């Protein structure tokens, strides 16, 4: 395992330029961090790479280098993402970076310039491509040098994680994989598994955050530090609220209720007073995101000059996209530096919000957690409104990795010396739960591989029964189970040895 440090070194830079690769100094006009250079060096040695690093640390640059190198070789790159919104943003970013003619897009409902050298797509599209019967004269994987798996930690998603496993298992070995993941507890196991099922793979790990995070807690009494100076536990001034005797939570849980949550307008005002805006305010419901925009009432977060700039951009947008302008409440809120961003918003309106937020003209955007998935909307602060969420399998607490992914959106590299993460008192979760999540380690990746009838039919169309069975048995879950079996066998061997000595 490679443990990377944040500062670039001459030795690492020289190594990265070696082999059949492209000198990174020809691609980027700024010094690279060591972990980026080490990943580039591994790619130039012909290895696939797993890059595990905190959100906002610069992992995407490794994927961008793979693109520059493929273009220099006259080859292609597929860049996969978990979300259509992220694919659309990558299309815009890469067009600006590499030229319109070089970039295409494939999602479930859109196909743009699919023969381009760089094709951005959702991971499901890539998986389906691997299952499709390749035409002798039209192989979609021909000339593909590398596949970038952005947000690879989505392997943990209970509904969609299997797509990432299937993509890795079935990707042809000559194609290099660039797996970009947020910090996970078992990145070494992921790397070892990819090496077994795909080919030589190098793990690059960095735990360095370019912009450190400060955790705060907001209750009806105000905004206060959440953690102690060491960041290992609750701040001495944080008091865990205890319900009066006899007060019970309604419903099935016996957990006592917490104090009422502070109004959103109060939370935003507290942050504005401390110069903690712009902020992404995470709320796990589209309806409540829109409601929160209305709940801020007439609160204005922008100056007259900023308002004039928003007005000019909104007028130009309205002229070009009259059908995409949201109702009067949302347009009015936009003029005050407030917006909602979620899957129910038209893509063109979301693009406008992203543009204005990147320019610092929107001060608070209420968003569902999909915005934590790498969409380029860097903020000074993130606010996490609830420490539990409703899922298809019922209500559950946030996982540590989910919390860290949202928290990691705070802090803009090159703009902020500090990023701020604000957790908010809710009716049933308070400072204790916030402290536990803020100090919890990253979760390990687990296998979500689920052989479906469709998968089996796809495999049998292309392979014999024995080969199809062998491919299904390559899953990450089977690999992890094998590790447990090795440990059990070692324990049995030790017990047998002890018995023989009695």
Locate each region found by the language model.
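Helicase-associated low-complexity/disordered flanking segments
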Residues: 1-49, 75-76, 232, 304-335
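Walker A/P-loop NTP-binding motif
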Residues: 41-48, 59-75, 165-171
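Conserved nucleic-acid-binding Ia/Ib motif block in the N-terminal RecA-like helicase ATPase lobe
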Residues: 75-131, 192, 202
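Conserved C-terminal RecA-like helicase domain
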Residues: 80, 95-104, 282, 286-364, ...
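SF2 helicase catalytic motif II
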Residues: 119, 123-127, 134-179
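Conserved interdomain linker/interface between the two RecA-like ATPase lobes of SF2 helicase motors
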Residues: 169, 176-178, 183-295, 339, ...
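Conserved segment of the helicase C-terminal RecA-like domain
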Residues: 377, 381-439
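Long, largely alpha-helical accessory region at the distal end of helicase-like NTP-driven motors
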Residues: 429-502
């Amino acid at each position: 395992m490679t443990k990377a440090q944040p500062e670039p070194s001459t030795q690492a830079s020289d190594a990265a330029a070696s082999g059949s690769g492209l000198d990174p100094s020809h691609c980027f006009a700024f010094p690279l961090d060591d972990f980026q250079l080490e990943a580039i060096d591994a790619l130039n040695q012909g290895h696939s790479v797993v890059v595990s690093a905190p959100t906002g640390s610069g992992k995407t640059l490794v994927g961008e280098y793979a693109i520059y190198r493929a273009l220099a070789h006259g080859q292609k790159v597929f860049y996969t993402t978990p979300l259509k919104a992220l694919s659309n943003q990558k299309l815009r970013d890469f067009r600006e970076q590499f030229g319109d003619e070089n970039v295409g897009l494939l999602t479930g409902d859109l196909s743009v310039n699919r023969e381009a050298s760089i094709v951005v797509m959702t991971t499901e599209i890539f998986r389906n491509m691997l299952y499709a019967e390749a035409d002798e004269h039209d192989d979609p994987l021909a000339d593909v040098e590398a596949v970038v798996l952005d947000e690879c930690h989505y392997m943990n998603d209970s509904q969609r994680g299997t797509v990432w496993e299937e993509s890795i298992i079935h990707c042809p070995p000559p194609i290099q994989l660039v797996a970009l993941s947020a910090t996970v507890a078992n990145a070494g196991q992921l790397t070892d598994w990819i090496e077994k099922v795909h080919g030589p793979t190098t793990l690059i790990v960095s735990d360095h955050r370019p912009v450190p995070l400060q955790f705060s807690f907001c209750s009806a009494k105000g905004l206060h530090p959440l953690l102690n100076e060491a960041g290992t536990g609750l701040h001495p001034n944080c008091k865990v609220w205890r319900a009066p005797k006899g007060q019970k939570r309604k419903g099935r849980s016996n957990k006592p209720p917490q104090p009422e949550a502070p109004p959103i307008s109060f939370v935003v005002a507290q942050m504005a007073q401390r110069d903690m805006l712009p902020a992404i305010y995470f709320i796990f419901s589209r309806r409540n995101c829109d409601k929160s925009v209305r709940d801020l009432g007439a609160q204005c977060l922008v100056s007259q000059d900023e308002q004039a700039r928003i007005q000019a951009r909104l007028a130009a947008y309205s002229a070009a996209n009259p059908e995409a302008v949201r109702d009067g409440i949302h347009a009015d809120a936009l003029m005050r530096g407030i917006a909602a961003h979620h899957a129910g918003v038209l893509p063109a309106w979301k693009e406008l919000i992203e543009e204005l937020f990147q320019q610092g003209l929107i001060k608070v955007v209420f968003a569902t957690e999909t915005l934590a998935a790498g969409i380029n909307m860097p903020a000074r602060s993130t606010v996490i409104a609830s420490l539990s969420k409703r899922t298809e399998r019922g209500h559950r607490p946030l996982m540590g990795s989910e919390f860290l992914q949202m928290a990691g959106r705070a802090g803009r590299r090159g703009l902020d010396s500090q990023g701020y993460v604000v957790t908010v008192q809710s009716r049933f979760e308070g400072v204790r739960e916030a402290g536990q999540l803020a100090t919890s380690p990253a979760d390990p990746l687990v296998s979500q591989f689920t052989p479906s009838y469709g998968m089996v039919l796809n495999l049998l169309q292309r392979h014999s029964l024995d080969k199809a069975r062998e491919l299904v048995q390559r899953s990450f879950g089977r690999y992890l189970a094998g590790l447990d079996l090795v440990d059990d066998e070692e324990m049995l061997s030790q017990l047998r040895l002890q018995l023989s000595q009695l």
